[in-house]
Amino acid sequence: MITVATAECFTLGKIGTTIHKIASGYEECKNHRYYNIINGNVKIISSSFIPSIEGAEKLLNLGAPLPKCDYEYSYSKAYTEKNDLKVAHILAKGLKNSLNCNIAIATTAGVGRGGICIISDKNEYLFTTDIEGDLISKKNIIQRQKNGIDKTINKFVEILKKEYFL
């Protein structure tokens, strides 16, 4: 069984929840296009929505502080796209090290297309959504979120096929 963990910000835990529901055989997911790949082969060992720096640092035992936010925004992390990519990588690495899972997925997005990182047992994948968004002004954040969820799950399944031969 391939173990998976997520640390999500702008995707609000929906990647981990979706994978969990498919993996667990929820009735509503039995017709999902990836059901036959995920169900019976994958299990979620942790799925977290972590919007704050403090939460990420404490939960994931990062060992070093995350970068200072590029933007002031309530209590959530808010970075440029460049720093979102760095932070997503740090979060995924912390998650993989803390939980010793096969695949760690992390997402974060402030201003720009956001940052997504998937770390498998063999490789690291760092990418963005296809949608420019702005957490501060709330511009395109729902569209960016949906795109990020879809793109990440598609990439996750691509990794399962390529690296785990499913």
UniProtKB/Swiss-Prot annotation:
It holds the Pfam family HcgF. Belongs to the UPF0254 family. This is UPF0254 protein Maeo_0668. The lineage of its organism: Archaea, Methanobacteriati, Methanobacteriota, Methanomada group, Methanococci.
